[in-house]
């Protein structure tokens, strides 16, 4: 179920304050956050936000295409190593 429009998008308060503070600067700074549930808003466009995946911070460069998505979508928490190889393939 989607979030109600009247509530607006969720974004952590401290992250929002950092985004507003860095949008006025000339030099771009990487913003670190643990908030994977925060929604990407238009004020974040052209910023680099490092999202924690449980082990390390993954840098995400925000473009207009990413607006409306969650930050956690772009920092995977699991590593897919592939399915087990079948030994029965060559036997007969």
Curated annotation (Swiss-Prot):
The keyword Signal does not apply. It comes from the Bacteria. Keywords: Ribonucleoprotein, Ribosomal protein, RNA-binding, rRNA-binding. It holds the Pfam family Ribosomal_S19. One of its GO terms (cellular component) is small ribosomal subunit. One of its GO terms (molecular function) is structural constituent of ribosome. One of its GO terms (biological process) is translation. InterPro entries: Ribosomal_uS19, Ribosomal_uS19_bac-type, Ribosomal_uS19_CS, Ribosomal_uS19_SF. The keyword Ribosomal protein applies. Protein S19 forms a complex with S13 that binds strongly to the 16S ribosomal RNA. Belongs to the universal ribosomal protein uS19 family. NCBIfam families: rpsS_bact. This is Small ribosomal subunit protein uS19. It comes from Borrelia turicatae (strain 91E135).
């Amino acid at each position: 179920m989607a979030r109600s429009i009247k509530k607006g998008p969720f974004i952590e308060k401290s992250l929002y304050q950092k985004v507003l503070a860095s949008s006025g600067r000339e030099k771009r700074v990487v913003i670190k956050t643990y908030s994977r549930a925060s929604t990407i808003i238009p004020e974040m466009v052209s910023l680099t936000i490092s999202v924690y995946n449980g082990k390390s911070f993954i840098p995400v460069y925000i473009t207009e295409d990413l607006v409306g998505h969650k930050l956690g979508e772009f920092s995977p928490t699991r590593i897919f190593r592939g399915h087990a190889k079948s030994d029965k393939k060559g036997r007969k």
